Amino acid sequence: MGANVSTPDQRFQVTHFRSTKPWTPRPEIYPFKVNSPCIVEIKNMNQWKSRLNALKDTNKLLVIEFTAKWCGPCKTLEPKLEELAAKYTDVEFVKIDVDVLMSVWMEFNLSTLPAIVFMKRGREVDMVVGVKVDELERKLNKYTQSFF
């Protein structure tokens, strides 16, 4: 008896510590980004159409990541894609959840996840299906260096 009983002074110290030291994650423990500002998540058809129309008349490369919450390989690819989006700042990266916007996924005649589609001037120029990071980076290099 008494092993789990704290004195009033000990309770004050814990309460005082909690009130004066707000918790913040330390970068060495949490090095990942919770929400990548480099990849825009498209959540509805209007957002998709406006993004596509805005880039039709530019030479900017649009990289579309088709994903789903239940897709294991998609989750494997996500951190690498965020790295690439941070590296290739001149490229527009968007993410589309196929469960939310199935019609967009079907426009591209896709059947496998993850799928990455490359577009320039409103038309599809290439794609990568599956977790093929080397191929993805090679194509990013190819389309960011070429102009047409």
Curated annotation (Swiss-Prot):
Q: Does the keyword Disulfide bond apply?
A: yes
Q: What is its main location?
A: cytoplasm
**InterPro entries named in the record:** Thioredoxin-like_sf, Thioredoxin_CS, Thioredoxin_domain, Thioredoxin_H-type-like
* Pfam families per UniProt: Thioredoxin (PF00085)
Q: Which UniProt keywords apply?
A: Cytoplasm, Disulfide bond, Electron transport, Redox-active center, Transport
Kindly give the CDD domains that the UniProt entry links to this protein: TRX_family (cd02947)
Q: Could you tell me where this protein is found in the cell? A: Cytoplasm
> Which parts of the sequence are marked as the site Contributes to redox potential value?
72-73
Is the keyword Electron transport assigned to this protein? yes
Question: Where do the catalytic residues lie?
Answer: 71, 74
Q: Which GO terms describe its cellular component?
A: cytoplasm
| Disulfide bond annotation, renumbered to this chain | 71-74
Instruction: Describe the location of the Thioredoxin domain by residue ranges.
Output: 1-145
> What is the stated purpose of this protein?
Probable thiol-disulfide oxidoreductase that may be involved in the redox regulation of a number of cytosolic enzymes.
- Similarity annotation: Belongs to the thioredoxin family. Plant H-type subfamily.
Write down what this protein is called.
Answer: Thioredoxin H8
Source species, please?
Arabidopsis thaliana
